[in-house]
Design a protein with these regions (language model features):
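Hydrophobic alpha-helical transmembrane bundles of multi-pass membrane proteins
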Residues: 2-365
């Protein structure tokens, strides 16, 4: 064998040896990495931390969406009222959130989630009493704060153009400190409406407990009833009734921003309702969130569509303002049972709410 052949054979052997060594070490490294990763992922503490992290992120994302409903309310209220009252309405919406956040943190959260059947115990500034079940207490406080602010904002729209700013501050204080926390304690806080023990009032009377998944009653109904009482006490807006006593429509100064406000509220409702799942880490959570998204959207569409149709038949042309309110009526109506009803049921609920809204406006006028 000549010198050139020996050299070539040597190089071939070296290349083969290097290839075998590379494959062997790569396989060992891959097995070690796989073993390490699977061990890390399979650790119960790691899985729990990951689950809590995902749930917390989803809860805070939903809280941001609900917070974004505040400009939606501001635009709707400003668009549906006269231009001279715009600054007053916008200031009230800022006050709702600023005062509401401080007061709910100071005392409202304790009254809502503290121990007690009728009302919780106030834990001034102290959040250590609450066990979030894996969710950070401070994050859950923020989530509940934006719901409290929503209840207060509803009152602003109903009493627009005839409420002194100073008196509206009193409303905000009572809603944030007492009314919303007490009604919330009866339900989400584990109070008497949620007491499923044998012999309890709900089980003895109805055979079941109260169900309000995302706040049709706790948030929207509370705000709505306060608004109705306030509007009844204050009376109609100036120019609402003529000398003959007949009701006159007071057109909003800018339906464009009112429509934009409804779109923002619709968008924010996808945090309001699905966010109440308070979890997003499992397949069951993902399915539940998806179902709530669907029922929420269908109810809104049905409410708006049938409000449009009925207003068209009654008045000879479709009404934009009634259609916008029909969408909101459908959203409010589905909020309690969005996790339980079928998609078809959501359409029925939205339809009823959209039609009922039109006749309710006529009745109140």
């Amino acid at each position: 064998m000549d010198k050139h052949s020996k050299c070539s054979l040597y190089r071939l052997r070296m290349a083969l040896a290097i290839s075998i060594a590379f494959c062997f070490t790569t396989d060992i490294f891959a097995q070690a990495t796989s073993t390490t990763d699977s061990t890390a992922i399979a650790t119960p503490d790691t899985v729990g931390e990951l689950t809590n992290g995902l749930n917390t992120v989803w809860m805070l994302l939903a809280a941001m969406l609900v917070f974004f409903m505040q400009p939606g309310f501001a635009l709707v209220e400003a668009g549906f009222t006269r231009v001279k009252n715009t600054a007053n309405i916008l200031m009230k919406n800022f006050v709702d959130f600023m005062f509401g956040s401080l007061l709910y943190w100071f005392i409202g959260f304790g009254l809502m989630f503290g121990a007690g059947g009728f009302i919780g115990m106030p834990h001034f500034f102290d959040l250590s009493f609450y066990d979030g079940g894996g969710l950070p207490t401070e994050g859950f406080l923020v989530f509940q704060t934006v719901f409290c602010a929503t209840a207060a904002t509803i009152v602003s729209g109903a009493m627009a153009e005839r409420t002194k700013f100073s008196m509206y501050l009193v409303y905000t204080i009572f809603i944030s400190v007492l009314i919303y926390p007490v009604s919330g304690h009866w339900t989400w806080g584990g109070g008497w409406l949620m007491n499923g023990e044998a012999g309890s009032f709900m089980m003895e009377t109805f055979g079941t407990t109260f169900h309000d998944f995302a706040g049709s009653t706790i948030v929207h109904s509370v705000g709505g009833w306060i608004a109705l009482v306030g509007a009844a006490i204050l009376g109609p807006r100036i120019g609402k009734y003529g000398k003959d006593g007949k009701s006159r429509a007071i057109p909003g100064h800018n339906l464009t921003i009112a429509a934009l406000g409804v779109f923002i509220l619709w968008f924010g409702w996808f945090g309001f309702n699905p966010g109440s799942q308070l979890a997003a880490a499992t397949t069951d959570d993902a399915r539940a969130i998806s179902h709530v998204f669907l029922t929420t959207n269908l109810a809104a569409c049905a409410g708006g569509f049938f409000a449009l149709a009925v207003s068209w038949m009654k008045y000879g042309k479709p009404s934009l303002s009634l259609t916008l309110n029909g969408i909101l009526a459908g959203l409010v109506g589905i909020t309690a049972g969005c996790d339980m009803v079928s998609p078809f049921g959501a359409v029925i609920i939205g339809t009823i709410c959209g039609i009922l809204m039109i006749y309710s406006v006529e009745f109140i006028d």
